[in-house]
């Protein structure tokens, strides 16, 4: 009975989320921008990426509670950890996809002046980053997976300062993005997106630590490993609240373009 109710609850929320997403999409497109256009398709993909990003992070947040539950068997805890990884990969794909989609749409809106070869390079590099991220997911419980995850993190170490500098420089009027009446929103959105990458990077550290700690726990009970697991998850949950607020802010500026 509980399983049925739980499934019904998840289905109702999924239906609500779908209706809400369609409503936001129609509101943001407007009556004068209907039809299958390049911008409309990119916006549709952007909405899907945003939904999986935010929804995926919520799923990981709830599933992770069972990972540190000492009352559960190691097998069950490991199963919950695997579920968290399965959900998280969708969020990772979403957050990476938002970058090329946003830069491409920004060019069509006239707030990001670089098109042509620049956009081609952005899409190629984003595809390479996605390949790296997905490969790390498939090899997540091996040494190869850990190394791939480290390379994924190195990409973020390079990308984050580049985006922070570019967005702040643009807000100060020095480019590379255009600013003016009703154009500041794009640079603000890029800055907030870079903040989410910072938080996400720390959450990546936490999930990578899970793999290491579960290797220790697989050898037998270990109080120190259990304590560290609980400590890291407690920090992750605190970060998650700020993460959601920042994600919502990114969506707000993207939808309203109010500044």
Task: State each model region's role.
Residues 2-5, 13-41:
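Short, strongly hydrophobic alpha-helical membrane anchors
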Residues 8, 12-15, 106-111:
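Membrane-protein biogenesis/insertion across secretory and organellar systems
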């Amino acid at each position: 009975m509980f399983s049925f109710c739980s499934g019904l609850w998840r289905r109702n929320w999924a239906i609500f989320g779908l209706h809400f997403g369609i409503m936001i999409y129609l509101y943001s497109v407007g009556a004068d921008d209907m039809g299958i256009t390049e911008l409309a398709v990119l916006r549709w993909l952007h909405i899907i990426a945003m939904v999986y990003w935010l929804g995926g992070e919520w799923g990981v947040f709830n599933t992770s509670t069972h990972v540190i539950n000492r009352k559960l068997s190691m097998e069950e805890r490991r199963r919950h950890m695997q579920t968290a990884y399965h959900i998280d990969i969708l969020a990772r794909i979403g957050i990476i996809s938002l970058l090329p989609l946003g830069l491409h749409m920004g060019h069509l809106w006239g707030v990001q002046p670089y098109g042509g070869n620049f956009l081609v390079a952005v899409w190629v590099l984003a595809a390479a980053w996605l390949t790296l991220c997905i490969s790390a997911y498939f090899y997540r419980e091996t040494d190869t997976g850990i190394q791939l995850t480290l390379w994924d993190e190195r990409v973020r170490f390079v990308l984050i300062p580049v985006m922070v500098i570019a967005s702040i420089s643009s807000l100060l009027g020095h480019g590379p993005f255009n600013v003016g009446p009703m154009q500041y929103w794009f640079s603000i959105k890029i800055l907030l997106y870079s903040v989410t990458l910072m938080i996400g990077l720390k959450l990546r550290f936490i999930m990578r630590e899970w793999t290491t700690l579960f290797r220790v726990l697989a050898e037998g009970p270990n109080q120190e490993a259990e304590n560290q697991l609980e400590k890291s998850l407690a920090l992750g949950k605190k970060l998650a609240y700020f993460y959601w607020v920042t994600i919502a802010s990114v969506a707000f500026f993207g939808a309203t373009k109010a500044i």
